[in-house]
């Protein structure tokens, strides 16, 4: 039986949708099937956007790649030793059933500090309500933060509100600080990746035209190789 060091609650694009296909080839990691994607296949796919090689992509997606293409609802956490994964799954399914599926707004490319992501063109209160509910009701499943985990969040650079959220809920960018996004690259240096992303943005309808409804939430787990893969998904009502 596989062991997972951390768990996360995500939105993931529907399997075989144009957006899921894009994320799979962009990162070279398929979290829904837990497998790496051959670089030759990636280049063949990305040619449709005018991207001819992976050099500018791969050096900027190494960190984001391990998490798979997703939108975070609850960021990765270690499971409290007093609870089992089955209990976590059952509670997550219970919460999912309390929410009705809803519409996404249109997506656009945005630079946020030193990373790039797809974001909706306006705040979606439905996603915020879902994330907040998940954070509150699944908080007991989270192991207490260690000093090392707190230090990783650079507390001296956080606002007072973000610091309070970190200590109360385990992560600074949730609850009132939550902003749904689907990361494309993080820790970006230089502007070469931006030029590749502009090619994606000019053709974004190819990958975004099928994504209308937010209708499922996913539980991902961090495997022994440090890659996050899908473990289960639950439909909204």
Residue ranges of predicted features:
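Basic, often amphipathic N-terminal segments
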Residues: 1-112, 125-211, 224-237
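Generic recognition of long tandem-repeat/solenoid scaffolds
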Residues: 116-120
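Surface loops and adjacent helix of pleckstrin homology
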Residues: 121, 222
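Small/polar glycine-rich anion-binding or flexible loop at a beta-alpha turn
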Residues: 213-221
């Amino acid at each position: 039986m596989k062991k997972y060091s951390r768990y996360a609650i995500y939105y993931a694009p529907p399997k075989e949708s144009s957006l899921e296909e894009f994320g799979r080839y962009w990162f070279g990691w398929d979290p829904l099937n837990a497998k790496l994607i051959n670089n030759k296949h990636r280049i063949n796919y990305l040619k449709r956007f005018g991207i001819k090689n992976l050099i500018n992509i791969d050096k900027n997606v190494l960190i984001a790649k391990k998490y798979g293409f997703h939108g975070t609802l609850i960021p990765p956490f270690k499971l409290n030793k007093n609870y089992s994964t089955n209990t976590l799954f059952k509670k997550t399914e219970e919460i999912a059933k309390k929410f009705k599926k809803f519409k996404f707004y249109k997506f656009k490319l945005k630079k946020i500090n030193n990373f790039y992501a797809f974001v909706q063109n306006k705040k979606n209160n439905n996603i915020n309500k879902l994330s907040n509910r998940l954070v509150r009701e699944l908080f007991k499943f989270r192991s207490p933060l260690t000093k090392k985990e707190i230090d990783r969040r650079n507390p001296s650079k956080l606002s007072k509100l973000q610091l309070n959220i970190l200590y109360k809920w385990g992560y600074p960018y949730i609850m009132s600080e939550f902003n749904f996004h689907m990361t494309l690259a993080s820790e970006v240096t230089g502007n070469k990746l931006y030029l590749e992303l502009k090619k994606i943005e000019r053709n974004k309808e190819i990958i975004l035209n099928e994504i209308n409804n937010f209708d499922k939430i996913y539980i991902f787990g961090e495997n022994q190789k440090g890659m996050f893969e899908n473990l289960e998904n639950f439909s909204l009502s």
